[in-house]
Amino acid sequence: MGNMFANLFKGLFGKKEMRILMVGLDAAGKTTILYKLKLGEIVTTIPTIGFNVETVEYKNISFTVWDVGGQDKIRPLWRHYFQNTQGLIFVVDSNDRERVNEAREELMRMLAEDELRDAVLLVFANKQDLPNAMNAAEITDKLGLHSLRHRNWYIQATCATSGDGLYEGLDWLSNQLRNQK
């Protein structure tokens, strides 16, 4: 009984929690984004084999962010992280025009999974600081985001190294969580 009141109190006044899965092709900037959000600084990264997981506190929400490696050989493992995921962050290297179709295929494959049917989608169009980077509208088109029905999605132009756009993305996620019944 006491536990019920504690949960009610936490629900009304305490932190909300959101489980986030962050994926994307290798070298898109996922790990850099994770640690920029967690530590506020740029860290030296190596390709992620497996995953990194961190809790990021922002606006009274505790985001548990799973950063899963994006190399093609380990992408089949992404599905093991789908369960209970409320938000999906898909990171795209906006400068990598050659692999944007590959990114689209991976994104659409994931969104077809039953375990992710209720997850909201945030796309980070990363590396906007590079001179040849596609803007958010172009990434939206290339990923086919307008074709998504029955799913809340948002695209945010970002630069992981400066932090530009990252918190705007978290704002959108936190608003989505607040609007869930």
From Swiss-Prot:
Q: What Pfam families does the entry give?
A: Arf
Its principal location? Golgi
* Keywords attached to this entry: ER-Golgi transport, Golgi apparatus, GTP-binding, Hydrolase, Lipoprotein, Membrane, Myristate, Nucleotide-binding, Protein transport, Transport
- Please give the superkingdom of this protein's source: Eukaryota
**Listed EC numbers:** 3.6.5.2
Protein location: Golgi apparatus membrane
- Lipid addition (N-myristoyl glycine) is recorded at G2
Function according to Swiss-Prot or TrEMBL: Small GTPase involved in protein trafficking between different compartments. Modulates vesicle budding and uncoating within the Golgi complex. In its GTP-bound form, triggers the recruitment of coatomer proteins to the Golgi membrane. The hydrolysis of ARF1-bound GTP, which is mediated by ARFGAPs proteins, is required for dissociation of coat proteins from Golgi membranes and vesicles.
Query: Important for the stable binding to the membranes: where is this region?
Result: 3-16
Catalysed reaction, written as an equation: GTP + H2O = GDP + phosphate + H(+)
Q: What EC class is this?
A: hydrolase
**What influences the activity of this protein, per its activity regulation comment?**
Alternates between an inactive GDP-bound form and an active GTP-bound form. Activated by a guanine nucleotide-exchange factor (GEF) and inactivated by GTPase-activating protein (GAP).
Quick one: which residues bind GTP?
G24, L25, D26, A27, A28, G29, K30, T31, T32, N126, K127, Q128, D129, A160
Q: How does it sit in the membrane?
A: Lipid-anchor
Q: What is the residue range of the signal peptide feature?
A: none
InterPro entries associated with the record: Arf1-5-like, P-loop_NTPase, Small_GTP-bd, Small_GTPase_ARF, Small_GTPase_ARF/SAR
Q: Would you identify the family this protein belongs to, as annotated?
A: Belongs to the small GTPase superfamily. Arf family.
Annotated protein name in UniProt: ADP-ribosylation factor 1
**Gene Ontology biological process terms in this record:** intracellular protein transport; vesicle-mediated transport
Q: Which residues form a coiled coil?
A: none
GO CC terms, sorted: cytoplasm; Golgi membrane; plasma membrane
Q: Name one GO molecular function term.
A: GTP binding
Q: Which organism is it from?
A: Xenopus laevis
